[in-house]
Curated annotation (Swiss-Prot):
This is 4-diphosphocytidyl-2-C-methyl-D-erythritol kinase. The active site is at residues 13, 138. It is an enzyme of class 2 (transferase). ATP binds at residues 96-106. Signal peptide: none annotated. It comes from Vibrio campbellii (strain ATCC BAA-1116). PANTHER family: 4-DIPHOSPHOCYTIDYL-2-C-METHYL-D-ERYTHRITOL KINASE, CHLOROPLASTIC (PTHR43527:SF2). InterPro entries: GHMP_kinase_C_dom, GHMP_kinase_C_sf, GHMP_kinase_N_dom, IspE, Ribosomal_Su5_D2-typ_SF, Ribsml_uS5_D2-typ_fold_subgr. The gene is ispE. Keywords: ATP-binding, Isoprene biosynthesis, Kinase, Nucleotide-binding, Transferase.
Length: 290
């Protein structure tokens, strides 16, 4: 066990496009989507110990410990690896919950990757992704740490290298239930499947966007405003929307025009996750037990 206090990023992600191609017999939606990380997110400070207990601070209001995805990830790793170590985890939370940018899934993946290193359980990315999939469909993307083209019901991942553009990400003050969007009778479910090269050279669309804009006027209003300045769309099922720019200064110029009451940030796309880069830094710095 490595008992140093270590800091780990928990980055946000964007769905640069999202197409719904059909439905499986058991009701899941078949889709094609492109995940890219951004250099903005939460941070976990983790101190491994031999208590066997997982403690997290501060508590997330309205979320009992055993419903916290970080706790679920840590205890799932303990069980999978038959590990008796524990940890105290401090969460610095800046990503919104339920925003479509992967906040909870990213937290779970960061816990898995960090504790696998600190506890020296030596599980592979495939094994960590298997644990993560039981926690949430997006967790494996964060575990693997590369931008990915996802197909099927989201389980088929292949590396992708979209341009690392600058993004202005805005969160309208609404909470959107994914089930409500995927269950809506008017949702497009028959977009033809295309290969990644074709999709990268086609204007990007999110098939959920039309329904979300219809049901949530705040999202529609924010997207209409962003579209005046740059290509913009919904990420996931929302509520976050984003505009893409070729430079940081362009994105920050538009950010400055937003009301102080609007939650927003500027970030750059990253095809290698900041989490993966941090793991490599710790591994190369010879943080080893004495």
């Amino acid at each position: 066990m490595i008992d140093l206090s270590t800091r780990w990023p928990s980055p946000a992600k964007l769905n640069l496009f999202l197409y719904i191609n059909g439905r499986t017999e058991n009701g899941y939606h078949e889709l094609q989507t492109l995940f890219q990380f951004v250099d903005h997110g939460d941070e976990l400070t983790i101190q491994a110990n031999d208590s066997g207990e997982i403690t997290i601070s501060p508590e997330i209001e309205g979320v009992p410990l055993k419903d916290n995805l970080i706790w679920k990830a840590a205890t799932a790793l303990q069980r999978f690896a038959n590990c008796s170590y524990g940890a105290h985890i401090d969460l610095h939370k800046i990503l919104p919950m339920g925003g479509g940018i992967g906040g909870g899934s990213s937290n779970a993946a960061t816990a898995l990757v960090a504790l696998n290193y600190l506890w020296q359980t030596n599980l592979s990315d495939d094994e960590l992704a298997e644990i993560g999939l039981a926690l949430g469909a997006d967790v494996p993307v964060f575990v693997r740490g590369f931008s990915a083209f996802a197909e099927g019901v989201g389980e088929k991942l292949s590396p992708a290298h979209p341009d690392e553009k600058w993004y202005l990400v805005v969160r309208p003050n609404v909470s959107i239930a994914t089930a409500d969007i995927f269950g809506h009778p008017d949702l497009t479910r028959n977009t033809p499947k295309r290969d990644l090269e074709t999709l990268l050279n086609t204007p990007s669309v999110n098939d959920c966007e039309k329904i979300v804009r219809m049901l949530y006027p705040e999202v529609d209003k924010q997207l209409s405003w962003l579209l005046q300045y740059a290509p913009s769309r919904l990420t996931g099922t929302g509520s976050c929307v984003f505009a893409e720019f070729s430079s940081k200064s362009e994105a920050e110029t538009i950010l400055a025009q937003l009301s102080d009451k609007v939650s927003a940030f500027v970030a750059q796309g990253r095809n290698i996750s900041p989490l993966k880069e941090t793991l490599a830094e710790y591994q190369s710095a010879s943080h080893r037990p004495i």
